[in-house]
């Protein structure tokens, strides 16, 4: 009989990252299937440590994955802290190093240096090439929430002020209620409800953005849905400048012309005052929203775009948006990932894992190029 798979859930280290790759619910199912699950203590995680203990997981110290036995598979969400020591375990995580992101070679080279392996969560795909688990829906939902909140803030505050920091909500209802209240305050001051243009409207992310817009009371005729059909002629697009809020939800798989540029932005006739780049391909040389250079944070959700005409323009480029709703986002993601995790004992033959390993090997070969 093969030895049980040992999963070690590491504590996330990114500030304000409350999500978790495993939840108490999915941990129980893994334990029932014969896995061993070690969970690092975490003051940040939306789930209490005790919730994992209650389902039978073994609690271990935060950061102990570094010296954990090599037969444990290390699972987490966001990239590891920037260190240089070689990585000797098998890791399951989002690593953001396969699309030529800034510093990708430094990130990726740590794995072959220690004879470790990376199974990148972004590239775990089923037989149809569809990702088995993604945070897209909640990323779009949270991004739209911050976008609408920013727009409402602009209507009720002077241009010299930016939207203050936001923090995680315990559940979706509280978030929706807060945005509704902000919108009502803007309308009370004489503003009409905003028009929202969503690019990537047919995907998970776009669906989440549209769902938020509806739930906070933005009328259907104010929600403009674009997908590949509408963008195939190539940008930049005047229609973006004519909307109040632009939400970019596309998955960037190849270079495309920019959706927006300064020629469109630097006009008195521009209506656009909020851009939410949910895709947040900030360091990607082909970012289709090339009007900002930094990833924003929950502490400072937006940065102003340097324009010479038209209303104030704020951009939100937070790269961990689903953390605004960490409990729902984690439950949905982990439940979607579970069938693949249950195949880990057969990872040498199960297609979802062999494809991910082949992709890792392919990109490792590129390091020396």
UniProtKB/Swiss-Prot annotation:
The UniProt record gives the binding positions of NAD(+) as: 130, 203-204, 227, 231, 251, 278, 318-321
Residues involved in L-saccharopine binding: 19, 78, 101, 131, 135, 279-281
Instruction: Please report the name of this protein according to its UniProt entry.
Output: Saccharopine dehydrogenase [NAD(+), L-lysine-forming]
What's a GO cellular component annotated to this UniProt protein? Answer: cytoplasm
Q: Name one Pfam family in it.
A: AlaDh_PNT_N
Name the pathway it acts in: Amino-acid biosynthesis; L-lysine biosynthesis via AAA pathway; L-lysine from L-alpha-aminoadipate (fungal route): step 3/3
Query: What is a biological process (GO) this protein takes part in?
Result: lysine biosynthetic process via aminoadipic acid
**Mind giving the lineage of the organism this protein is from?**
Eukaryota, Fungi, Dikarya, Ascomycota, Saccharomycotina
Q: State if Amino-acid biosynthesis is listed as a keyword.
A: yes
Known partners and oligomeric status: Monomer.
| Annotated S-S bridges | 205-249
Q: Which Gene3D superfamilies match?
A: NAD(P)-binding Rossmann-like Domain (3.40.50.720)
Q: Where is the active site?
A: 78 (proton acceptor), 96 (proton donor)
Q: Under which EC number(s) is this enzyme classified?
A: 1.5.1.7
Say what the protein does.
Catalyzes the NAD(+)-dependent cleavage of saccharopine to L-lysine and 2-oxoglutarate, the final step in the alpha-aminoadipate (AAA) pathway for lysin biosynthesis.
Which organism's genome codes for this protein?
A: Yarrowia lipolytica (strain CLIB 122 / E 150) (Yeast)
